[in-house]
Regions:
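Cytosolic, membrane-interface loops and tails of multi-pass inner-membrane proteins
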Residues: 20-51, 188-204
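Short, non-helical or kinked segments that cap or interrupt transmembrane helices
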Residues: 29-41, 103-116, 143-151
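Nucleotide and nucleotide-moiety/phosphate-recognizing core
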Residues: 7, 52-58, 62-102, 124-125, ...
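Interfacial segments of multi-pass membrane proteins
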Residues: 45-50, 71-75, 93, 97, ...
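N-terminal signal-anchor transmembrane alpha helix
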Residues: 1-26
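Loop-to-transmembrane alpha-helix initiation sites
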Residues: 128, 144-151, 164-175
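C-terminal ends of transmembrane helices
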Residues: 19-22, 97-107, 134-141, 184-188
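Alpha-helical transmembrane segments of multi-pass membrane proteins
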Residues: 10-13, 91-98, 134, 138, ...
Length: 204
């Protein structure tokens, strides 16, 4: 039973609202009241500035990495033959925690940065490709949501191309769907031409 408690820890760590903590502790600001009202790195940059945005990004990516690591530890302790499945479960629980945080009444962020941390651990080559595409799309359009959806769509495609194990490919597909579904409101605003670009705003 003990090893599987680490998977529960992965969910709890994923649930930690990094953006909310950075905003409230260091800036006396609740990100949910400004900009896109999201607690992710993009809105942290938009409202609080680059250093805050970078801190939130690193923390959220770290949650994904740590979730997979805890899953790997669980597998190594319980049954090494199941390690890859435990790694995926740990990452998925961290992603679910980020998107449905126990500390935020089961609400949360979009899951992009945490998902990036997960695939960084599971599939670093694919992560480099996906991150490059994200940078290009965001650099050209200044629309983080568009870059995030494009990157999410690319995850299962690159995993298929590089012949990742089926459990990893299936996870990549599920994670991509979670990220895209979490961006449904952004997609509607994109179609309406109302989506916020990644630029600083003045708090009122």
């Amino acid at each position: 039973m003990y090893p599987f408690l680490l998977l529960l820890v992965a969910y709890v760590i994923g649930s930690v609202p990094s953006g909310l903590i950075v905003g409230r502790v260091f800036f006396n600001t609740d990100l949910r009241d400004y900009g896109s009202k999201n607690i992710g790195a993009t809105n942290a940059y938009r409202v609080l500035g680059a250093p805050a945005g970078l801190c939130v990004l690193i923390a959220d990516v770290g949650k994904g990495v740590l979730g997979v690591y805890l899953g790997q530890t669980t597998g190594n302790i319980y049954d090494p033959a199941l390690t890859v499945y435990c790694m995926i479960m740990g990452g998925l629980l961290a992603l679910i925690g980020h998107s449905a945080s126990v500390f935020l009444h089961f609400k949360g962020g979009k899951g992009v940065a945490t998902g990036l941390g997960i695939i960084l651990y599971l599939a670093p080559v694919e992560t480099a490709i996906v991150f490059f595409v994200w940078c290009v799309v965001v650099g050209l359009t200044r629309l983080v949501s568009l870059g995030s959806v494009a990157a999410a769509l690319l995850v299962p495609l690159t995993m298929w191309y590089f012949k990742e194990p089926w459990p990893v490919f299936i996870f990549g597909t599920v994670a991509a769907l979670i990220v895209i579904v979490r961006h449904k409101d952004n997609l509607i605003r994109l179609l309406q031409g109302k989506e916020l670009k990644v630029e600083r705003i003045e708090k009122k």
